[in-house]
Amino acid sequence: MSAINVPYTGFSFLPHQEVGVRWMIDREMSGDGICRGGILADDMGLGKTWQTIGLLTNCLVGKTLLVAPPVLISQWQEALDKSGVITALFWDKKWKGAEDAAVYLVTYDKVWRNMKLMTERVWDRVVLDEGHFIRNAKTKRAQSLLQVRGDRKWVLSGTPVQNGLSDFRTLLDWLGYEVPRIGAMAACQELAKTVLLRRPITLLANVMPAPPTHEKETLVYDGGAEFNTFNVLVGRLQDAMSANYPSACILELYLRVQMFISHPQIYRDAMNRKYGGSYFSGPWQGTATKLAAFNTLLDVDSVSPTLVFCNFKLEMDYVADAATAHGYKVYFIRGGMGGAERKHGISESIRLAKAGVPVLMICQIVAGNCGLNLQHLTRVIFYTQHWNPSVMDQAMTRSYRYGQKSEVTVHHLILGSPELRNIDRCMLEKHAEKRSLTFMLCPSLKFAFHPDFAVPGAGGSGLLMPLNFEEQEQEPEDPVE
């Protein structure tokens, strides 16, 4: 068997990566008559980027369109430049870079905003990094990519199935496969055997620390205004669901509860914005249980390099204030940030962490849950849960991935109890349901180290979250140019 080229002098592929590169080359050279490509679905942290660059440098074609989330564009550009691959970047409605570029880098949202430029040619290869971004076939993002033509097509995603069979069908549709509606599960299972390559991170168990330790911080209200308001909000949500209100209305009520759980003032500010400042007067004067619990974690350890995941921007500000008060140097990754600002924050946090300065990175979970290498942060705190288990898995592996040398601890702040019909606990129940469907489709898609929390007293007493919430979800768009 002939040797494969490495991206640059001094680089060497790990054994599983060489297998992956050869599999990708074989798929492009022979295919199956329908698709010269496939889905590289290795666990997060196994090096899908470098395997893809291995394909690019060993199987040369004319022009490759590489689509990625904004947070990953600079990471791709650096890796490709280091490998001697000439790139062009789409910015300000045109391609910027060498005319003889081999790889054209663009974000998902810029594809659908500039469809004429993206579809005026048949690309020699199209690569979707974090390809699960097109899982919802109804979105502009998915519809636009379905119109982009390519002789070879690749999906890179550690979580190609997040909500169910429709996710996988959309990816197969993009690759060119037709899946029948009758017997769809069996058809998808059969295709997954050939079109999808998946290896678990346990392959690297001998060169990585032990799996992350998950610590669940279960918090209970002590009564008072916070307790009473929470119950009122949960009651409204349950009433709306029982009455079969429109999903958009239910989603809004659900988000209001999430805001209140994060910090009551976030909820009050949101309601005042909606009603022109007339809904509440004055700031919240009561307790903020979850923020108090976060402060307690920092009281116990105000030194460990820490990664905190949040949902709301104001929530991130409260977390930042608490961390700063404990002596942390704080950095952000959130929707709307430019690539240069994001890159600077990550590099500075790495530099300071190496110097022994306490650093804390706050990530908005849908903006910083995929692709980033943040191994220097060894304590992960989920300030709030997310209803999509794959988002949680992606987020956790920003820290626990190949190259991590230290033990990683993950904290989950779970507010409430069964008696309070806790929202966060119900999310974890929904996680179990979604994961079981994913494993049914393809057993190898099981992520090795996600937490399986028991939910005591859940039997029918908790809220049942609507299954169509994911249809409402939107990742942050690119910064406005």
Language model regions located:
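Conserved pre-motif I regulatory segment
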Residues: 1-39
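Conserved Helicase C-terminal RecA-like lobe
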Residues: 9, 36-37, 43, 51-60, ...
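Conserved helicase ATPase motor motifs in RecA-like P-loop NTPase domains
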Residues: 44, 151-164
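Conserved Walker A/P-loop ATP-binding site and its immediately adjacent core
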Residues: 62-82, 311-314
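Conserved helix-turn-beta segment of the N-terminal RecA-like "Helicase ATP-binding" lobe
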Residues: 72-93, 175-178
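Inter-lobe coupling linker of SF2 helicases/translocases
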Residues: 105-110, 116-120, 140-150, 155, ...
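SF2 helicase motor core recognition
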Residues: 112-116, 163-165, 316-320, 360-378, ...
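A conserved SF2-helicase RecA2
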Residues: 387-396, 400-478
